Amino acid sequence: MTLTERLREKISRAFYNHGLLCASYPIPIILFTGFCILACCYPLLKLPLPGTGPVEFTTPVKDYSPPPVDSDRKQGEPTEQPEWYVGAPVAYVQQIFVKSSVFPWHKNLLAVDVFRSPLSRAFQLVEEIRNHVLRDSSGIRSLEELCLQVTDLLPGLRKLRNLLPEHGCLLLSPGNFWQNDWERFHADPDIIGTIHQHEPKTLQTSATLKDLLFGVPGKYSGVSLYTRKRMVSYTITLVFQHYHAKFLGSLRARLMLLHPSPNCSLRAESLVHVHFKEEIGVAELIPLVTTYIILFAYIYFSTRKIDMVKSKWGLALAAVVTVLSSLLMSVGLCTLFGLTPTLNGGEIFPYLVVVIGLENVLVLTKSVVSTPVDLEVKLRIAQGLSSESWSIMKNMATELGIILIGYFTLVPAIQEFCLFAVVGLVSDFFLQMLFFTTVLSIDIRRMELADLNKRLPPEACLPSAKPVGQPTRYERQLAVRPSTPHTITLQPSSFRNLRLPKRLRVVYFLARTRLAQRLIMAGTVVWIGILVYTDPAGLRNYLAAQVTEQSPLGEGALAPMPVPSGMLPPSHPDPAFSIFPPDAPKLPENQTSPGESPERGGPAEVVHDSPVPEVTWGPEDEELWRKLSFRHWPTLFSYYNITLAKRYISLLPVIPVTLRLNPREALEGRHPQDGRSAWPPPGPIPAGHWEAGPKGPGGVQAHGDVTLYKVAALGLATGIVLVLLLLCLYRVLCPRNYGQLGGGPGRRRRGELPCDDYGYAPPETEIVPLVLRGHLMDIECLASDGMLLVSCCLAGHVCVWDAQTGDCLTRIPRPGRQRRDSGVGSGLEAQESWERLSDGGKAGPEEPGDSPPLRHRPRGPPPPSLFGDQPDLTCLIDTNFSAQPRSSQPTQPEPRHRAVCGRSRDSPGYDFSCLVQRVYQEEGLAAVCTPALRPPSPGPVLSQAPEDEGGSPEKGSPSLAWAPSAEGSIWSLELQGNLIVVGRSSGRLEVWDAIEGVLCCSSEEVSSGITALVFLDKRIVAARLNGSLDFFSLETHTALSPLQFRGTPGRGSSPASPVYSSSDTVACHLTHTVPCAHQKPITALKAAAGRLVTGSQDHTLRVFRLEDSCCLFTLQGHSGAITTVYIDQTMVLASGGQDGAICLWDVLTGSRVSHVFAHRGDVTSLTCTTSCVISSGLDDLISIWDRSTGIKFYSIQQDLGCGASLGVISDNLLVTGGQGCVSFWDLNYGDLLQTVYLGKNSEAQPARQILVLDNAAIVCNFGSELSLVYVPSVLEKLD
């Protein structure tokens, strides 16, 4: 067993156990699922409804002026402006985006030095902004005149009064954590603790205080002990009430002059106006609500045709609740983990959840309702889940793999979508497996058995299984039987579609192909590929940056050079000119500060292998505010009792500020406690030591950002705990043998159900067939005309059976023996003797009363009454070897083989005539010597049997029914009417009367045996081992119309076979002979529509005209010997060979229509219907092909040794054999309709051959026995 098979088996078993759990305890599981849904949806209480997110409108900065109010707008004037863009905004928001880093980085710097010095410069920037004034011709403009003046905070925000501004300008910066006091900041030993002390203990869904003051999301701030970029980002937010272009321009120019950003390419060209809608937007919900209504209606009208569902409304409602809960759980979990579900630009997410959820609902419903109706509900649920387990997990793994690949592209848009998608998939899988499966089990449980019997659906319109409480079924279940009698492999994948309505066909098509999920996966891959290449943070820009860095002219190849003071202009971005505070002490040349060692800052101490914090500006920095929560601005203004509902604010272009600090400033800003044992020591330490995660100070908890990686780890841990909890619940609640055989006598193991690949287990029944016993060896030849059945075993015995009653009508013994009676009574008597023989009877031999008292064998079976005309010779067998006289010259007795009567007698042997002669004289019979061969007839007419040599069976003297001769073994057999045509290995052709058991005529012997026969109307064709063909014509010599018909037409279209009277004289004339039809032995022979087709080991087929033996075509197309041939009245010819190929030919033109390789090995049998070709091979595989195109529909894997056991009952009904059973298949769709077991006696025997009769009966060859099975009536109605 391969790894994939073991994994598939384990997944199937896990889903099977889960199905048992859900169906056994539905109420607790539904309550548990409901609690999980409510818990996951709790964060949604703080979110607006979908569609109420902010709306944007962009205008250019140049010549901007506030729009007029609504009354000033001209009526009917066409405009592209939205309706809400009227009047002045609530406020103008100006963000000053600061990026700061310490460069160059020394290895003796601490982790806290990354953000302490950059944050300290925020106080200086705030002072510069507050002190900025504009002097022009109109007067002096200051910040206090233009900013938004705020008053007190709301009464419930007392904790924030020292952190947010009151009674002044609304100006926010990280310095607000320390009341904009630099001394407080410098004296704070735990900066991170101060920043996070006002954070809620649980994950917050709306804007937090840190986001408000920093102005950027927490993960972009860089204020963390574990950051590796060594860059700090924050904003200083100014809120203006009036727009003054000159003041804003002068502020921008001053800040960019003081803190230039040489590589900044941000464009200050547009204003973004953001309008906030009402909290309740019902109009925006109409498309989504309509979608769910359509979903409900579609599932309801689809399940109306599934009669195995009790409540269609309930099932549809459960499906809608499942999909809606999946969406709400996804959004709630995303919100809980800090992912803001704005759905801006991605509002397709709810509809993707609908599509995926609908498809999974259809898959589960289809799988469960296709299970056998006679099983318990929990077993049906378990089996339905198990059958779809592999496809569900395979699709789940594929989707998660695509999401994982997309996440590691590091493109923000793709990462956000992937995080939403993974949460949605996990939520949907959780609800499908727990909620919908449990609801489905409750609904099916309500379907009572009486209602099922009244309204059986197309999937279960077959008779139910035998009552499970009967001991016979229990014994049969314990018997050894293969786990899967049949495995149907569909090419391409198909599903159960037996007489289904069109709406159910659509449903099952979606469930089978997973079309929606595959299209979504393909679209996701294409979308990810496009974004990876086109996104600003994607592959194209990354490659361009790499090429630039590796270029000899790139900035990375030029080392920084020390420049003496005073050589650069004031606008140069050197940190010494832009960062030093104006009151910083000027040190003389070659001197250092008091606390700094002379070696510190030297070139040897710089960590060159660490990532250089290059301050870069990209297009994503222009609108970093978009990454904030959509509740960021409404939350800020709501603190001052200002609402933004139905109003808008204007966001001004960002002002970039770059700060580069040298290591000396980082050391000067360090707190005294930073150098203690709490942080890495300031002495020389290995490079990157603090990056491995320094410990926080004792007793002080180091607050870290709740990053996505932490959330992922938390989610993984939660999932593991949940799985372990469910496993423990299963172990506690379910016993080890739950749902298996030990639970009851009629409960069946799932592996014993003949399920196909899609989990459908059709009803199985058990009947007692008519067993035809009469052969001691395996049956080799079998023929029937619909009413009579002829069988021949390897011993040479021929039995004629009545196909209606199963009675043995005639028994023809081996050659070389005489027959005294051939009536029906003797046949029944012989049948009884053979049954006693096969049953191992211990009765003693019956001796003739007038025989002398001779020594008897101590035990042994009685001689069969079949040879009653012979004296009993068993008394002559002497087993007392010790009392026998020793012969001086030992003789070798001749072997007692009767099959070869014409062997040479030249070698001396022991003569038994002295013993046998006395017994024959006492019986009154003449001594019988070995008869010689009858001389061949001089002409081509077959010699007639000497019927006048013996009287009727009623006469006293025994008659010779036929002259014994060395005919050889029987190689071929055909039956028509009451005539049996036998072809023997000696080349002799014989015609027998099937009713009387007499030989009508025979041909002369030739050196080549007869390998195949065709008996059609009055023509007989014999194919011989040497490749020749003999054409015979059958004639009678009584009246002009000697034929009478027996019975009525059967299931076939042809009338019943003619019956020849026993008083008729039957003769056969050899009309034509084709001496060299093939170069090698003929192995296949068929005739229809006046054409005869032969197949040989010379790899060719030949088509002859039946009336004059004229060869019409020689067909070449196989690379191996021909093994089977089929031809019908429509002149369609099919052939199979040892090369495993099947060829379709046109008999009218001799052209090959199609050629396919069907099997791995010989093609053993071949038959056709009006629409398909059915083949079987030595690989025990039955394949069904399209007759017109040669396309393979599907294949059925048979049991070992049962590959050739198949028969076609009608154009859409196929019967196949298995280990002690026969199965019925629908040819149109490949569905297993029913499996019928033939009792305990046949369980261990494979069905080697199946022959379909015209009276709705099937004959199965189980070695030395035949089983006569009548087709179930429901299949006849289906036909």
Swiss-Prot record:
Induction: By androgen-bound AR and glucocorticoid-bound NR3C1 in a prostate cancer cell line (LNCaP). Residues 1-18, 301-312, 366-401, 445-518, 731-1279 are cytoplasmic. Membrane region forms a homotetramer. Component of the SCAP-SREBP complex (composed of SCAP and SREBF1/SREBP1 or SREBF2/SREBP2); interacts with SREBF1/SREBP1 or SREBF2/SREBP2 through its C-terminal cytoplasmic domain. Forms a ternary complex with INSIG1 or INSIG2 through its transmembrane domains at high sterol concentrations. Interacts with PAQR3; the interaction anchors the SCAP-SREBP complex to the Golgi apparatus in low cholesterol conditions. Interacts with the SEC23-SEC24 complex in a SAR1-GTP-dependent manner through an ER export signal in its third cytoplasmic loop. The keyword Calcium does not apply. There is a cross-link at K454, K466 (Glycyl lysine isopeptide (Lys-Gly) (interchain with G-Cter in ubiquitin)). Residues 40-279, 334-344, 423, 540-709 are lumenal. Residues 60-80, 579-615, 668-696, 811-904, 931-962 are annotated as: Disordered. The gene is SCAP. Residues 284-442 form the SSD domain. This is Sterol regulatory element-binding protein cleavage-activating protein. The modification Phosphoserine is found at S822, S838, S851, S907, S937. It is found in: Endoplasmic reticulum membrane; Golgi apparatus membrane; Cytoplasmic vesicle, COPII-coated vesicle membrane. PANTHER family: STEROL REGULATORY ELEMENT-BINDING PROTEIN CLEAVAGE-ACTIVATING PROTEIN. WD repeats lie at residues 771-811, 952-1002, 1005-1042, 1077-1114, 1117-1155, 1158-1195, 1197-1235. Keywords: Cholesterol metabolism, Cytoplasmic vesicle, Endoplasmic reticulum, Glycoprotein, Golgi apparatus, Isopeptide bond, Lipid metabolism, Lipid-binding, Membrane, Methylation, Phosphoprotein, Repeat, Steroid metabolism, Sterol metabolism, Transmembrane, Transmembrane helix, Ubl conjugation, WD repeat.
